[in-house]
Amino acid sequence: MADVTDSAFRQIISTCSPPDVFYTEFVSADGLCSEKGRPKLMPHLAFKENERPIVAQFFGANPENFYKCAQLAVELGFDGIDINMGCPAGKIVKHDSGAGLIRNPELAKEIIHETKRGAGGLPVSVKTRIGYNKIVTEEWISHLIEAEPDAIIIHGRTMKEMSKVPAHWDEIGKAAVLCRKAGVLIIGNGDIKTHAEGLEKAKQYGLDGVMVGRGVFSNPWFFNPSVDPATKTPEEKITLLKKHVKLFTELWGNNKHFDVMKKFFKVYISGWEGAKELRMELMKSKNKEDVAKLLIS
């Protein structure tokens, strides 16, 4: 998730409840292949050893640039490469990137081929949706399988549906049937709220795994079912917030507005008397020093 799953966030999750695999934020393949864009985008590909195994995620519509980015991922030491064919944002799809590639299956296959060519043997996955304006799960997944990705991660909504309707897990199940026949790993995504629900969905629909997005954003302990976030003390949550702010500042410095960090405040500052008032004060902060002063007082 853009402006969420950076290295700072992933290190927090790794501390609380590491998943089986981490994915980076999606990064523009075109930007990484431009002299001006690469320096600005490289922090999005930063990671620490405690985030392994970790997969680099790219978006774009230029096969040659995916080849180059795959080579870059190998050079940086990533454990896998993911091609984003699922982002529904208008500014992405209008350039045939993200979910826009669902409308152009031949280009999508060419991108997969070029990514694999540059990947040096690293596994290559595709993250996508069940359709663009309408559901075309079986037709679309069949096209992708022809390019022989190592895995397909499928979100159970169309581009048009965004996140406005419940995920169509029956369609994810249809994709799973096709992938199993082809020997392609299949991972489902959409509306997973608990660890137990994820395991249940994987079993019910014959999946190799599930990917969690928004569920882990609100609960850093998501991948450790033995931990109930409600039992965490204010002191524990505040300590975790301080660590997150420190990591965020070390990673981004002045290259990303501090307001991006503020979306996490409710995750840590909630569940006790006075938390709302403290959170409102924290929302006025402009940097880690402001946060430190408020948390000390």
Name every feature range the model reports, one short phrase each.
Residues G37-R38, P43-F47, G90-L101:
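An active-site metal/cofactor-coordinating segment within enzyme catalytic domains
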